[in-house]
């Protein structure tokens, strides 16, 4: 199993991956798919469907250098042609582990991961401020 596929396995175990065409379609329509992965030997129809899922969104779709059987083996299935990773940081780590030059996708995911990090910091600061002030009270 390659490094990239290890990240897919880890994402599945952490609940950060959607596997198969219907779940990937649902998560991308909801705008929550950071990275859509398509196996190298997946059909043209599957590739077109994946591209249509992310069309008009800021989600990234790539073909990875792994077969359906290799992707399936990584997550404990027979075969897997399409998957989506929902966490930008996990998607970024996986993309960095994959061979090949994917500069545009890396930049997009880096921006998404930075936005998520900033949002989490703001949420933490807000929660800390609410605790210090004793919470919101009605008069």
Question: Language-model features: where?
Answer:
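Mid-chain, well-packed structural core segment of small domains
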Residues: 56-86
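C-terminal structural segments of small proteins and small subunits
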Residues: 77-114
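Short, ordered loop/turn segments at secondary-structure junctions
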Residues: 22, 41, 66-69, 88
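N-terminal positively charged helical leader segments and presequences
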Residues: 33-34, 40-47, 51, 60
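Helical mechanochemical/support elements of P-loop NTPase systems and associated helical scaffolds
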Residues: 4, 20, 46, 67, ...
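Charge-patterned, long linear interaction tracts outside catalytic cores
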Residues: 111-139
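N-terminal first-folded block
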Residues: 3-38
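Short, solvent-exposed amphipathic alpha-helical segments in soluble enzyme
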Residues: 51-56, 99-100
């Amino acid at each position: 199993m390659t490094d990239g596929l290890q990240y897919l396995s880890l994402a599945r175990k952490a609940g950060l991956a959607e596997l198969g065409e219907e779940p990937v379609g649902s998560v991308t329509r909801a705008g929550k798919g950071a990275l859509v992965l398509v196996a190298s030997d997946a059909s043209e129809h599957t590739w077109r469907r994946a591209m249509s899922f992310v069309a008009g969104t800021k989600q990234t779709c790539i073909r990875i250098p792994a077969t359906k059987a290799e992707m399936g083996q990584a997550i404990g299935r027979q075969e897997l042609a399409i998957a989506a990773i929902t966490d930008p940081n996990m998607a970024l780590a996986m993309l960095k582990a994959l061979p090949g030059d994917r500069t545009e996708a890396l930049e997009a995911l880096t921006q998404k991961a930075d936005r998520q990090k900033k949002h989490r910091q703001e949420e933490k600061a807000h929660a800390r401020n609410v605790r210090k002030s004793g919470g919101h009270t009605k008069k």
